[in-house]
Amino acid sequence: MAADGRDGKKIDVDPKLLELLACPLTKGPLAWDPERGELISRVAKLAYPVRDGIPIMLPSEARTLSAEDVLAPPPRLSGPA
């Protein structure tokens, strides 16, 4: 899974890492949004950034999801199935 980083390079998130990560507030699952390079917690309504391939799992660094973001279909995972 990849998204563009700040310098235009692709940022990859290992699918196995995604399976292990959980929202630090709800302990629930996260979804990868490759378009924004964020890990999404729909329950907490937060989007955690991924910088240089490293998930920043601090609630203070997370973006609050809008009502539209929460209601939107979950992002599709890219890469091999």
UniProtKB/Swiss-Prot annotation:
Top-rank taxon of the source lineage equals Bacteria
Q: What InterPro entries does the database record attribute to this sequence? A: Trm112-like
Which residue ranges run through the membrane? none
Similarity field: Belongs to the UPF0434 family.
Name of the protein in its database record: UPF0434 protein msl4429
Gene3D superfamilies annotated for this entry?
2.20.25.10
Gene Ontology cellular-component terms listed = cytosol
Q: Which PANTHER family match?
A: PROTEIN PREY, MITOCHONDRIAL (PTHR33505:SF4), ZGC:162634 (PTHR33505)
Please give the organism.
Mesorhizobium japonicum (strain LMG 29417 / CECT 9101 / MAFF 303099)
Name any one Pfam family assigned in the record. Answer: Trm112p
